[in-house]
Amino acid sequence: MNFETTIGLEVHIELKTNSKMYSPSPVNYGAEPNTNTNVIDWGYPGTLPTLNKGAYTLGMMVATALHADIARDTHFDRKNYFYPDNPKAYQITQYEQPLGKDGYIEVEIDGHKKQIGIAELHVEEDAGKNTHGSDGYSYVDLNRQGTALIEIVSKPDMSTPEEAYAYLETLRQIVQFTGASDVKMEEGSMRVDTNISVRPIGAKKYGVKSELKNLNSFNHVRLGLAYEIKRQSQLLIAGETIRPETRRFDEKSGETYLMRVKSGADDYRYFPEPDLPPMHIGDDWLKEVQDNMPEMPAKRRTRYVDELGLPEYDAGVLTNTKEMSDFFEAAVANGAAPKQVSNWLMGEVNAYLNDKQIDLQETALTPEHLAQMINLIKDGIISSKIAKKVFQEIIQNDTDPKAWVEAKGMVQLSDPAKLTPIITGILDDNQQSIDDFKNGKDRAVGFLVGKIMKETRGQANPKVVNDLLMAELNKR
């Protein structure tokens, strides 16, 4: 029996704001517990929320980037539930009329493009965080309570774990390029829940879906979905019934485990939020958002290929993060050849970042210094070998590359007037190598070049050395 899979994703993204969605409490990741919170977040009687317009504007930017229809008239709703990390016993969200509807993302998998629909996206506030201590007590940190979120709900348009992975990666890039969020799963600013069901091919009715939680990376999403496809398919083959469940993914075993069985639809008793007025998005506000939309990663990739002559692979790597893409553009603007900048960023820079497990912004490297170093190579002032030493200096210490090279005596020797006497001297001492060259033994040239480089302590320009050496050999 063959099956088809249906996958939908719900993604919560923390918006990059200085204060919370409905209160003036600051937002600082990693702050001491319960230091970024106030009576509005706690739901004290008599306190009133105030909408963070900046957060809503960021939500509109994300909606625009996802090609969604933005609701011009909307309101906020209360989602009622009790949990220790939610002292108000309700969440302010958008239920009846979300910020945006009917958007889409275009993903590419193995060279094939596919459009995945966005059912809706809405702004809301986050809950706090529960921690269960080894001392038998549970602790609540309300720093996160009230933080501005946008929830993006996909349509059930995905059918493989690879499509889900590509969707999340593309969504991460798009949101990051808008500047609305850092979208770092390790810091909780991007969280993913999946819904997945399996049914026999050709069946009109969707299968019973399971929800997956505890997905801490895109790879965990892919692995968890792959396991669920296998698990649900085996149940159907065995003639067993699939229950509507919430399951968690265990990264050690690569399997999913039951958290709870869903007995029915959750009843959150939504009703319009009485403490916030209805929202109207005027023409001026919408136009301001549209006029200030930054270039999206797909457009940058196209421009890098069409205008800068980069291979598609390079363009894809460079636009994986806005940080790397902006750095590339700044280095090119400082006069370095695009392909050379790309080579250094994808090679030495990425290797350094991976080795140190840090981001580019945590290094001392600047676009100006990288461009200057690349041009030192182009102008023959330093060799590629010396450039690697220069690179280690400028990425760690914010050093001017040209000044450092000159101070260290690393300027490449390219003057024929200085190189010729060295070359002739080495030839005079190595008649056997001259004879080998004349007898067609090409390795003799390599031997002589090595002697010259040793004599100049590696500072001789290899191209100039080769040209002068060949000219001198042909004279003898």
Swiss-Prot record:
Pfam entry (one): GatB_N
GO molecular function: asparaginyl-tRNA synthase (glutamine-hydrolyzing) activity; ATP binding; glutaminyl-tRNA synthase (glutamine-hydrolyzing) activity
GO biological process: glutaminyl-tRNAGln biosynthesis via transamidation; translation
Keywords, in A-Z order: ATP-binding, Ligase, Nucleotide-binding, Protein biosynthesis
InterPro entries: Asn/Gln-tRNA_amidoTrfase_suB/E (IPR017959), Asn/Gln-tRNA_Trfase_suB/E_cat (IPR006075), Asn/Gln_amidotransferase (IPR018027), Asn/Gln_tRNA_amidoTrase-B-like (IPR003789), GatB (IPR004413), GatB_C_1 (IPR042114), GatB_Yqey_C_2 (IPR023168), Gln-tRNA_amidoTrfase_suB_CS (IPR017958)
UniProt cross-references to SUPFAM superfamilies, sorted A to Z: GatB/YqeY motif, Glutamine synthetase/guanido kinase
E.C. numbers: 6.3.5.-
Reaction(s) the record says it catalyses: L-glutamyl-tRNA(Gln) + L-glutamine + ATP + H2O = L-glutaminyl-tRNA(Gln) + L-glutamate + ADP + phosphate + H(+); L-aspartyl-tRNA(Asn) + L-glutamine + ATP + H2O = L-asparaginyl-tRNA(Asn) + L-glutamate + ADP + phosphate + 2 H(+)
Function summary: Allows the formation of correctly charged Asn-tRNA(Asn) or Gln-tRNA(Gln) through the transamidation of misacylated Asp-tRNA(Asn) or Glu-tRNA(Gln) in organisms which lack either or both of asparaginyl-tRNA or glutaminyl-tRNA synthetases. The reaction takes place in the presence of glutamine and ATP through an activated phospho-Asp-tRNA(Asn) or phospho-Glu-tRNA(Gln).
Protein name: Aspartyl/glutamyl-tRNA(Asn/Gln) amidotransferase subunit B
Lineage: Bacteria, Bacillati, Bacillota, Bacilli, Lactobacillales
Gene: gatB
